[in-house]
Design a protein with these regions (language model features):
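A cross-kingdom C-terminal cell-surface attachment/processing module
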Residues: 261-279
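Surface-exposed loop/turn positions within long extracellular repeat scaffolds
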Residues: 1-14, 28, 34-40, 52-142, ...
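Short domain-boundary/entry signatures in modular proteins, especially
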Residues: 7-17, 177-186, 216, 257
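Carboxylate-dense, calcium-coordinating segments in secreted/extracellular and ER-lumen proteins
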Residues: 191-200, 226-232
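Glycine-rich phosphate/pyrophosphate-binding loop
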Residues: 141-179
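Short, threonine-centered small-residue motifs that mark membrane-proximal processing/anchoring sites
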Residues: 178, 186, 192, 219, ...
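Cytoplasmic C-terminal tails of single-pass
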Residues: 282-289
Length: 289
């Protein structure tokens, strides 16, 4: 499974670390002959099987997934590498993993499956390109897109009418984050609480028509915050319910600040607006029949 291959990039021929894992097979990087991945040579994953990156590697060369699945299973698995899932290739996260990659090309034709985890891209990926990838992965709303960024866990949840999605953050330092999330979880801490309510209200984007982000309350990726997003916020039933993405054996309870009277009042207004919108939509639907 260990091979040296020549790749042509522009006018330069470079060596590459090629790891082939056959269909129906799962191997860790150690089993594939690479207990550590380091240096500047690119890594190329081939074959229809799954390669699991278990170590904290220092590889600075790019990582391309041509076929099959490359699963990240360490918080620093490819912290300095640009990860490129090509058409026919998938990058996935181990359950509940929170990891960092050096860069990510989620619009290169392949798929990134966050499962119920979180990935931070250190540099190189713009918020615009990140949202483009998320919208592709969302597909028709079922989170079963064949390219971009998706979540197989969100897809399973949505299939049983449990509202889940992929949330995202522009961290302000050149890095961006994407994670399995519930609508309303503005800060991606896997809770919907007063901090999220404050974000939804304090940024002043609700019904303003101004461009907005997930942090500011845009949960359906249409670039604005409106009654549809308020409906998404309240539709999860998760407000003040604790952690909704707790690993087995871990506590799902965390202390949060008490909401102010003003926050509660504003939430009530937004909530009633969302309820009114839903009732209006139902009446219109009955009328059409």
């Amino acid at each position: 499974n260990k091979a040296l291959r020549l790749t042509y990039t522009g006018s330069t021929i470079l060596g590459a670390i090629t790891i082939n894992v056959g269909s129906g097979t799962t191997q860790t990087q150690t089993q594939a002959g690479y207990p550590t991945l380091s240096g500047s040579l690119p890594l190329v994953k081939t074959g229809g099987g799954t390669l699991v990156i278990t170590a904290a590697n220092t590889l600075t060369g790019s990582t391309s997934v041509q076929q099959g699945t490359l699963q990240l299973a360490n918080a620093a698995a490819l912290a300095s590498s640009k990860v490129i899932p090509l058409a026919g290739g998938t990058v996935s996260l181990a359950p509940y993993l929170q990891t960092t990659v050096g860069d990510l090309a989620p619009n290169a034709g392949g798929l990134v499956d966050l499962a119920n985890g979180l990935v931070t891209v250190a540099s190189g990926l713009s918020p615009t390109d990140l949202v483009t990838a998320i919208v592709a992965g969302r597909g028709d709303g079922s989170w079963t897109g064949t390219s971009g960024i998706t979540s197989s866990v969100a897809a399973s949840d949505v299939a049983v009418s449990l509202p889940r999605a992929v949330g995202w953050l522009d961290n302000g330092d050149g890095s961006v984050t994407a994670a399995y999330a519930a609508p309303g979880d503005t800060n991606l801490d896997w809770q919907v609480d007063v901090l999220d309510a404050s974000n939804f209200l304090s940024f002043g984007k609700f019904d303003s028509g101004l461009a907005a982000t997930w942090l500011e309350g845009d949960f359906n990726y249409d670039g604005v915050v409106d009654v549809l997003d308020a409906a998404d916020f309240f539709g999860t039933g998760l407000y003040d319910a604790g952690n909704y993405n707790t690993p087995p054996g871990a506590s799902g309870i965390a202390a949060v600040p008490e909401p102010s009277a003003a926050t509660l009042a504003a939430l009530a207004v937004a909530g009633w607006a969302a309820i009114g919108y839903r009732n209006q939509a139902r009446r219109a639907c009955r009328h059409d029949r």
